Amino acid sequence: MKDLRFGRLKCYSLHLGILPLTVLVLVFFCFVCLSLRSQEWGHPGAVNRKAYPQPRVLTPTRTDVLVLTPWLAPIIWEGTFDIDTLNEQFRLRNTTIGLTVFAVKKYVVFLKLFLETAEQHFMVGHKVIYYVFTDRPADVPQVPLGAGRRLVVLTVRNYTRWQDVSMHRMEVISHFSEQRFRHEVDYLVCADVDMKFRDHVGVEILSALFGTLHPGFYRSRRESFTYERRPQSQAYIPWDQGDFYYMGAFFGGSVVEVHHLTKACHQAMVEDQANGIEAVWHDESHLNKYLLYHKPTKVLSPEYMWDQQLLGWPSIMKKLRYVAVPKNHQAIRN
């Protein structure tokens, strides 16, 4: 009888131990299911039945520019996409886009125009989180935001040299991608603050990994690119290699791919620093090295990075979407 009672007691204790564990597993499973962004099972949502012109296989959308890379990544120009169709696809996925921008030291003066024009032209109709990194949080302007859009201010330290501010951007984005961004957004767009949005910049740019053609080199041969040419640097690219020259002021992709890019660039810069060398164009040099060997899945045309004051407005550019703001570089950087 004693053995029987002891056996029942053990069984009862076992049940008591299993029950909380089962509840914990079920709670965790439900949390994971709810947390999988853009991967919900069930009804795919309402589909837009709007009529649009049929794509014509024998009629290219643009014949004056390259629209496809050798690795089959599209190059995004005006006339190569249907934004209504793309908007519908990304809304069905309930996409949230993060836009990172660094407004450090005197560069905070550009933030108001940047945010105001972003509200007019950047990812209109989609959920957006602006991540503003600054050493002057009190100077961040109050800009009215549309529905589904919010601003997050994140405090960072400043550096004496503007080059160091630029290079440490990679470290900061890498850290926050892993610790925060991956829980809040689906895509990241990393932009310079001393710019303004002049025309539509939308979901046509979104992809696993995208880079933007430098407006000063999109017509040039690789021998003219200002890659880092010293073999001692981790950013080194030989003279006989290179696809395009990418601008460091506008890049992005999925959070995981941006994390990989920024982490690799930061680690390369740390190694260069240990060896007493600094790449010719700092983080941009390392960005170009990374995108040479980790091909972007989309390439943005210079419509998405232009300086009209320096380059005018050539006829090949049907739209100027993201443009430089006139400034005194020396006064701002010092």
Curated annotation (Swiss-Prot):
Where in the sequence does glycosylation occur per the annotation?
94
Query: What is the protein name stated in its UniProt record?
Result: Histo-blood group ABO system transferase 2
Question: Which stretches face the Cytoplasmic side?
Answer: 1-15
Q: Which residues bind an alpha-L-fucosyl-(1->2)-beta-D-galactosyl derivative?
A: 214, 226, 284, 307
The domain-related comment in the record is: The conserved DXD motif is involved in cofactor binding. The manganese ion interacts with the beta-phosphate group of UDP and may also have a role in catalysis.
Provide the alphabetized UniProt keywords. Glycoprotein, Glycosyltransferase, Golgi apparatus, Manganese, Membrane, Metal-binding, Secreted, Signal-anchor, Transferase, Transmembrane, Transmembrane helix
Binding residues for UDP-N-acetyl-alpha-D-galactosamine? 102-104, 107, 192-194
Q: What is its EC number?
A: 2.4.1.40, 2.4.1.37
Catalysed reaction per UniProt?
an alpha-L-fucosyl-(1->2)-beta-D-galactosyl derivative + UDP-N-acetyl-alpha-D-galactosamine = an N-acetyl-alpha-D-galactosaminyl-(1->3)-[alpha-L-fucosyl-(1->2)]-beta-D-galactosyl derivative + UDP + H(+); an alpha-L-fucosyl-(1->2)-beta-D-galactosyl derivative + UDP-alpha-D-galactose = an alpha-D-galactosyl-(1->3)-[alpha-L-fucosyl-(1->2)]-beta-D-galactosyl derivative + UDP + H(+)
Question: Which metal ions or organic cofactors does this protein require, according to UniProt?
Answer: Mn(2+)
**A Gene Ontology MF term for this entry?**
nucleotide binding
Any one GO BP annotation for this protein: carbohydrate metabolic process
This entry carries the following GO cellular component terms, namely: extracellular region; Golgi apparatus; Golgi cisterna membrane; vesicle
Species per Swiss-Prot/TrEMBL record:
Rattus norvegicus (Rat)
What's the record's note on cofactor binding?
Binds 1 Mn(2+) ion per subunit.
